[in-house]
Amino acid sequence: MRMTVRHVRPPPVRTAQVTVLFADLRGYTGMAERLPAARVIPLLDEFLRSLAAAAENFGGTIFHMAGDGLMAGFAVDDDSGNGAHDALAAGRAMLRDFAPIAARWRRELEIDAGVGVGLHFGDVAVGVLGPSQHQAITLVGDTVNVAARLCSRARAGEVLFSCTVAAALEATAATDAATGAVPFLQLPQFELRGRRGPIDIWCLPAASRLAL
């Protein structure tokens, strides 16, 4: 019997204004070195489940989850909002929810771990990538790259966000409501690798930065 493979045409690429969130695990390299690989998998699963729940609780859509981190988009299907408040609240929830997990890992496994989060708001392309049997909807564009770079610069226990996110928050009062009145800092401009010109950065700071 001959089987016919149907190739379904993917939906057209569209553009949207989205707040993109990246989050990843600090301390993963040391964890992978010290523990058997089979022991690392359930720890990563616990970590990613915690992050995903925080993102989805604030309306985020998970677009990529691999290894020690994830990418989520906020307001992807909502033309009436920018997702900045929800993304910032989700980032803070990730830090809060992972804290007891990290404490248990430290107590039981002597592993130091934390979460770093980066946010950027702007235009993205929403489209399907990959061969038919492995297709996935994803976000592409400079906004995604900047969010990823900010995540890589964030310290454990910290959310870094760009000037576009700060502008999208619209007012200090709204920011305070989204962050639970946690102080946020404007950092000196810095260059992001592979991108022209410095950008303005704000953060919900880690204790290590507040102690400086």
Report residues per predicted region.
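Acidic/histidine metal-binding catalytic segments
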Residues: 66-67, 107-116, 159-163
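Alpha-helical scaffold within the catalytic cores of cyclic-nucleotide enzymes
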Residues: 45-60, 76-117, 142-143, 148, ...
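Short, surface-exposed loop/helix-turn segments at secondary-structure junctions
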Residues: 129-141, 175-183
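A structural signal for short, well-ordered beta-strand segments
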Residues: 20, 70, 115-121, 201
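Cytosolic regulatory/linker segments at or just downstream of nucleotide-handling modules
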Residues: 153-212
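Short gly/ser/thr-rich secondary-structure transition/capping motifs
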Residues: 1-6, 99-101
